Every structure is written in C-alpha cells, then in structure tokens.
UniProtKB/Swiss-Prot annotation:
Taxonomic lineage of the native organism: Bacteria, Bacillati, Bacillota, Bacilli, Bacillales
GO cellular component, one term: membrane
Protein name: Uncharacterized protein YfkS
Swiss-Prot/TrEMBL keywords: Membrane, Transmembrane, Transmembrane helix
Transmembrane segments: 32-49
Organism: Bacillus subtilis (strain 168)
Amino acid sequence: MISYIVQTLIVCIAIYAYEWKNFRSANNLTKWAFSLLIAGSAFLWIYMRVNPLLPRLGHLFKYIPF
C-alpha cells in the first residue's frame, strides 16, 4: 500500500509538472478535468493517510484494491 501511495504521488507530480506549462493556454474543459484529477488524487492520498481515523468511510473503498 505504501508503494501504491508513492507511485500515485510520483505520477500526479509528473502530470502536474508537465501540464502546468500548458495550463494557462488550455481551454476550460482541460482546466476543469486537470483540477478534478489533482483534487481527487489529493483526497485519496489524504484519506489513505488518515484511514484509521475514519472507519465509517471504509465501506466506500472496500471493493477497491489498494
């Protein structure tokens, strides 16, 4: 699971660094999709970090193999 988090962070940072150059000239759809991707990745990472503190939300990710 730790390796999954590290891989996800590396991929997100790489996508973020690559897309940041083109972010200002991108259209609105690309900006929204990119922002949602970063927000979703950050939410998943934070959720996995505080997972023991949030046992009631565990059923949401019960069927997703991390």
